C-alpha cells in the first residue's frame, strides 16, 4: 500500500482545531476556559505532568520487560519515585478540579462496582 504523505498531512491539518494550530486561537480558547471557571493553568500542568511522569514509569517497566533490566531494589525504588511524581501531578489535577483525592477514589470505587457487580468494594470505603 502506498501512502501519499502530503495528502495525509493535509488531512491532519484540516481536522485539527484552530486552537491547536494558531497561538491567537489558543489564547482565546484559554481565555474562554478561564472565564468558564476552569483552572486551566493547573489542569494543563496536571495533564502534561501525568502523561510525562507516567511515561517515565512505563520506560522503567519497558526496560525490565523487553531490554533485560533486572527486577531489583534499585529499580523498585526508581518506580516508586516516578509513581510519586505521578501522584504529585494527580494532586495538581485534584486542585484544578477542586476535588479531594478521597472523592476521586470513592468515584472510582463506584465505577468499579457498576463494572464488576459481583465484586464487593464496601470494605474499601470507611464511612
Where do the PLM segments sit?
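Extended low-complexity intrinsically disordered regions
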Residues: 1-65
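An amphipathic alpha-helical micro-motif enriched in hydrophobic residues
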Residues: 47-58, 73-105
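Conserved small/polar residues in nucleotide/adenosyl-binding loops
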Residues: 125-127
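Acidic/His metal-coordination segments adjacent to aromatic residues that form catalytic metal sites
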Residues: 64-72
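A short structural micro-motif
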Residues: 111-114
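Residue-level signal for alpha-helical context at structural boundaries
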Residues: 30, 72, 104, 122-123
Amino acid at each position: 500500500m502506498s501512502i501519499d504523505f502530503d495528502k495525509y498531512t493535509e488531512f491532519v491539518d484540516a481536522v485539527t482545531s484552530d486552537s491547536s494550530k494558531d497561538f491567537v486561537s489558543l489564547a482565546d480558547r484559554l481565555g474562554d476556559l478561564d472565564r468558564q471557571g476552569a483552572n486551566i493553568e493547573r489542569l494543563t500542568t496536571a495533564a502534561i505532568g501525568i502523561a510525562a511522569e507516567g511515561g517515565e514509569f512505563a520506560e522503567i517497566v519497558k526496560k525490565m520487560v523487553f531490554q533485560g533490566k533486572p527486577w531489583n531494589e534499585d529499580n523498585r525504588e526508581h518506580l516508586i519515585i516516578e509513581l510519586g511524581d505521578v501522584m504529585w501531578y494527580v494532586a495538581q489535577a485534584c486542585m484544578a478540579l477542586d476535588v479531594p483525592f478521597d472523592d476521586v477514589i470513592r468515584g472510582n470505587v463506584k465505577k468499579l462496582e457498576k463494572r464488576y457487580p459481583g465484586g464487593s468494594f464496601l470494605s474499601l470505603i470507611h464511612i
